[in-house]
Amino acid sequence: MAFGDAWKQLSWFYYQYLLVTALYMLEPWERTIFNSLLISVAAMAVYTGYVFMPQHIMAILHYFEVVQ
């Protein structure tokens, strides 16, 4: 029963996502392209944050002389 409830909840979130982004009006292939682009941009943002954030944090800490 828990799997069914979780599936209903995920379906509800996906339906809300379609409504908020107006993707329900698109063809399935257009929706796939949009979702692929969205996931690609999000993945690049996470990767960029992972790679460059430590450098920026260390520069800030050196600037405020927290770390020598």
Swiss-Prot record:
<feature type="site" description="Within the serine palmitoyltransferase (SPT) complex, defines the length of the acyl chain-binding pocket, determining the acyl-CoA substrate preference">
    <location>
        <position position="25"/>
    </location>
</feature>
<dbReference type="GO" id="GO:0005789">
    <property type="term" value="C:endoplasmic reticulum membrane"/>
</dbReference>
<feature type="topological domain" description="Cytoplasmic">
    <location>
        <begin position="55"/>
        <end position="68"/>
    </location>
</feature>
<keyword id="KW-1133">Transmembrane helix</keyword>
<feature type="topological domain" description="Cytoplasmic">
    <location>
        <begin position="1"/>
        <end position="9"/>
    </location>
</feature>
<dbReference type="InterPro" id="IPR024512">
    <property type="entry name" value="Ser_palmitoyltrfase_ssu-like"/>
</dbReference>
<feature type="topological domain" description="Lumenal">
    <location>
        <begin position="27"/>
        <end position="31"/>
    </location>
</feature>
<keyword id="KW-0812">Transmembrane</keyword>
<keyword id="KW-0256">Endoplasmic reticulum</keyword>
<feature type="transmembrane region" description="Helical">
    <location>
        <begin position="32"/>
        <end position="54"/>
    </location>
</feature>
<feature type="transmembrane region" description="Helical">
    <location>
        <begin position="10"/>
        <end position="26"/>
    </location>
</feature>
<protein>
    <recommendedName>
        <fullName>Serine palmitoyltransferase small subunit A</fullName>
    </recommendedName>
</protein>
<dbReference type="InterPro" id="IPR051900">
    <property type="entry name" value="SPT_small_subunit"/>
</dbReference>
<comment type="function">
    <text>Component of the serine palmitoyltransferase multisubunit enzyme (SPT) that catalyzes the initial and rate-limiting step in sphingolipid biosynthesis by condensing L-serine and activated acyl-CoA (most commonly palmitoyl-CoA) to form long-chain bases. The SPT complex is composed of SPTLC1, SPTLC2 or SPTLC3 and SPTSSA or SPTSSB. Within this complex, the heterodimer consisting of SPTLC1 and SPTLC2/SPTLC3 forms the catalytic core. Within the SPT complex, SPTSSA stimulates the catalytic activity and plays a role in substrate specificity, which depends upon the overall complex composition.</text>
</comment>
<dbReference type="GO" id="GO:0046513">
    <property type="term" value="P:ceramide biosynthetic process"/>
</dbReference>
<dbReference type="Pfam" id="PF11779">
    <property type="entry name" value="SPT_ssu-like"/>
</dbReference>
<keyword id="KW-0746">Sphingolipid metabolism</keyword>
<comment type="similarity">
    <text>Belongs to the SPTSS family. SPTSSA subfamily.</text>
</comment>
<comment type="subunit">
    <text>Component of the serine palmitoyltransferase (SPT) complex, which is composed of SPTLC1, SPTLC2 or SPTLC3 and SPTSSA or SPTSSB. The heterodimer consisting of SPTLC1 and SPTLC2/SPTLC3 forms the catalytic core of the enzyme, while SPTSSA or SPTSSB subunits determine substrate specificity. SPT also interacts with ORMDL proteins, especially ORMDL3, which negatively regulate SPT activity in the presence of ceramides.</text>
</comment>
<keyword id="KW-0443">Lipid metabolism</keyword>
<dbReference type="GO" id="GO:0017059">
    <property type="term" value="C:serine palmitoyltransferase complex"/>
</dbReference>
<keyword id="KW-0472">Membrane</keyword>
<comment type="pathway">
    <text>Lipid metabolism; sphingolipid metabolism.</text>
</comment>
